[in-house]
Amino acid sequence: MLTIRLALGGSKKRPFYHLTVTDSRNPRDGSHKEQVGFFNPVARGQEIRLSVNQERVAYWLSVGAQPSERVAQLLKESAKAAA
């Protein structure tokens, strides 16, 4: 099953996550089909906290990808900010 979830990046004490579309059996930071955005939980100043490619997310959801709980919250937040 395809899932949209967060893949951890960044460095120690500075987490950074990529929103990726991957098979649910793959490891968290393993191979993925596509990167559809990023999330920076420790953004400061002019740094962008959340960026999502809404068109690609809509496509992947239409073909059956399931977002993780945290990604679903982030997608809702992103849609609210875009409106």
UniProtKB/Swiss-Prot annotation:
Highest taxon of the lineage: Bacteria
Matching InterPro entries: Ribosomal_bS16 (IPR000307), Ribosomal_bS16_dom_sf (IPR023803)
Listed SUPFAM superfamilies: Ribosomal protein S16
Assigned protein family: Belongs to the bacterial ribosomal protein bS16 family.
N-terminal signal peptide: none
Presence of the UniProt keyword Cell division in the record: no
Single GO term (MF): structural constituent of ribosome
Pfam families: Ribosomal_S16
GO CC, alphabetical: cytoplasm; small ribosomal subunit
One GO biological process term: translation
Annotated keywords: Ribonucleoprotein, Ribosomal protein
Protein name: Small ribosomal subunit protein bS16
